Amino acid sequence: MKMASLSIYRGILKRTVPAAFYRLLRAEGEEEFLKAWGNFFAVLCERGLSESFADCLTGTALFDENAFSLAAAGGAQEFPPALLKGVERDLRIILELSALTPEDLLYDSPIDNPETLHLPAWGTGNPVKALQGALKDCIASMANYYRENGCGMYARYRAFIWRDSSIQPVAFPDKTRLSDLKGYELQRQMAIDNTLAFLEGLPANNCLLYGDRGTGKSSTVKAMLNEFYPRGLRVIEMPKESLMDFPKLVDQIAAIPMKFIIFIDDLSFSKETDTYAALKAVLEGGLAVRPENSLIYATSNQIGRAHV
């Protein structure tokens, strides 16, 4: 079975919709096939994809993190011939599968008279734009997409949170824009300038945004993300209670070709707190070396002369 032989893009087999489709293709016997059919259709409907299976399957491939997408996201212009052959074969299979209609599957199914069952049917729709056209052009389009947008979940999402020892995407991030914020323009501009320097590969600093509640500290970070994510900026919120996990977090992003702000909100600077000791260790390099693709932005409304 071709889908089982995916190599570079085999990561899509772990995703919900492709996995359900794979089980349908492998189903043997009438009962197993009908169960797999019903499950696949339900999965599509739950995600609002009942009319666009091709877009879903090819989109899953577009956002897959693999040897090709990582290399392209890192700026590679040339790739090993063997890798390109693997990519070409995988994309050909994915495009063929995305074009299969319910009628195609029923024709090769173990069901004797499928028309009498009136099974629910989905629409195929069209592949994502990057996978429309000649296959070699599609590979070039995919590579360009990765160079411009990154790969994996970092291409699909802009905001993340550290939870359960892993980086998890935020599907619906705060939509605040810089133009929405009023007051403290000088201080905000300093944070903006520092962030722009970071994105341009120039020297930049970790930032502590401090002041009374309601002065726009957290909103500034969220607004900068919405302003600059097309330029490769991503934000990972790290709960202050998880600061001891900092080495684990930076290990997971060190090789990702994006720029990350590690955002720590509402810090307390009492020397008796664990967060104070943990942040001090992070900033002084006691826990892990912070990779060049990351900065720490923290906010606090508790700061005195002794901490400046």
Where are these regions (language model features)?
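AAA+ P-loop ATPase mechanoenzymes
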Residues: 1-182, 186
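Pre-Walker A (pre-P-loop) alpha-helix and adjacent loop at the N terminus of AAA/AAA+ ATPase modules
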Residues: 173-208
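Short loop/turn elements that form and flank the Walker-type P-loop nucleotide-binding site
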Residues: 202-204, 231-232, 256-258, 290-293
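Conserved catalytic/switch belt of AAA+ P-loop NTPases
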Residues: 251-255, 270-307
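Walker B catalytic acidic pair
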Residues: 265-267
